[in-house]
Structure formats: structure tokens, C-alpha cells
Amino acid sequence: MKPNNPTGKLMKPAYLENVLEVCKEKNIYVVLDECFIEFCEKENSIVQKLSTYRNLLIVRAFTKIYAIPGVRLGYLMCSDKELLQKIRGQLPEWNLSVFAEAAGIACLQQQEYLKKTV
């Protein structure tokens, strides 16, 4: 997890990059949970490394920063298009409720809330 819950501790970038390199060499996927990344004071995401590491998958959720527990709404980022197609093929037909979709749209319109929260 990056940052860790409940401590908020972040992995050192050099350590994380080393893990990514070793896993890349061994053809191992790395799933990085960044659901709490918006609470960090400065940019600490590794999202800019997606194009370098096709084995990197980043998971984020709306539920943490927008304080909407129970609303199952999140997303995954990955640069491996073939893998994304495989993942999409495993999703249920109705993987997003109408309520969660409406909540997500409303959240994306609340930039002022984000500034106040962080």
C-alpha cells in the first residue's frame, strides 16, 4: 500500500523501483494500492512509471478521499493493453451500480472539496 493505512508511511521511491525492476525481470505483476495517495501532501504516486513497467497495476478508489464508504467505486491503471482486455473479460456484466456511477460523477465535480480535504 502506498501510503500505508493506518500509518500513512510511504515506500521509498528507490525501494519501490527496485521491486518493480526485479519483478519485471521475473515477469511478475505488481499490484500497487494507491487508494490513500490523495492524502499525501505532495505528489507521491508512481503513476508516471506505468509506461516503463508494463507489469505495474495501480489501484485507486473514490471511497477514501471522498468519504463515501460502502460505495464500491474505484479504478485500475495499467499500460499493458492485453492484460487490461483480459481483466475486462473477467468483470461481471453489471460491475458498477447506477448509484456508484452517479456518486463518482458528483465526486469528480468537487475539486474544491479536494483542496479543503488535503
Question: What function would you assign to each model-found segment?
Answer:
Residues 6-65:
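Active-site pre-lysine segment of PLP-dependent enzymes
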